[in-house]
Amino acid sequence: MGAQKGMLTQAELEQLVATGDIDTVIVAFTDMQGRLTGKRVSARLFVDDVAEHGAECCNYLLAVDVDMNTVDGYAISSWETGYGDMVMTPDFSTLRLLPWIPGSALVMADLSWTDGKPVKQAPRSILNRQMDRLAERGLV
């Protein structure tokens, strides 16, 4: 297992999938309400496809309230403009076991549009931009 307790490398995940110890991978991101959301995929599909290509999801997931109802006021997602697709690209530095869900692993994802441009409004994208700004100033 990875250097930190519960953390996994991609190779370790592949081995756990091959032995049947992991059967599900949750590919997740934080929505505008601070909740973890995303997709649950079979571990074999994750290893064979999602790890390299990512997984698509609807941008609706960024723009709903706590009851999963659509909310007015989001320029990127509405009934007027439509609900488009985003790509969740796994960040393997976040790959970890989920001990409270046996047989499962979790990986956080960076969001981009299907044309490859980052989803600037995604909380993780905002955080990464702020971390870059701090690094430019020598603060991290």
Show which residues each predicted segment covers.
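ATP/Mg2+-dependent ligation/transfer catalytic cores
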Residues: M1-V140
